[in-house]
Amino acid sequence: MERYIGTYQTFQTVSRKEAANLIGADNLIGDRYSIECTIEDGVQKAWLVNRFDQRVGYFEPKYSRELSILKAQGMTLVAVLSFVAFTDHPEPGYYWGDVAVFAFDPAYQTTMETFITSVSKEIGKGRRPRVQLETRGIENIIESNGTWLPSETVPYPAKEKGTALVKTHRSITDRLVEESRKGNKGCYLLSWAFLLSVVAFAILGMKSCGLF
């Protein structure tokens, strides 16, 4: 069994319902996902499942098969949301995304949890650390008990006509949402106050422009 395998991988959404969940507050950049390996109509399909037990997207069959093999070998699978994108063709367009995928030997659970948490924080800031590592990089993780981070980063995809990256980092509101998830009531109230203030300013702006 390998000690560690990491990569960035794109995924698709089934419908606009899943896409709506993906761009909402239940799925923030840097969030962690479990991976559920299934066989549907004889085809391998690995699903991304968020902390609220919602399926938000799936990988293409070839990569899904690779993940199912790793899982059958006993490796732990974890994914971290890297970005969300929208492509307007073919009409009516569709949402898709990218995640950092980690597979590791459960014997290194604590070390890898620490490493993945650090990578998640960096991704939340809009920085994508390189996770596809050679032997030396893997040894750095283990020797540091997970505190080591690669200095190299992976760039976002080049701009393409008809495609836009709609989520690449955590906004101020996203960070407040995350604190409220942790039970910080003050941040929960502050996040609502912030959203209401944005709405209020928008209304005042429209009034000043004579729109109503």
Set out the residue ranges of the language-model regions.
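Conserved active-site motif detector
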Residues: 1-212
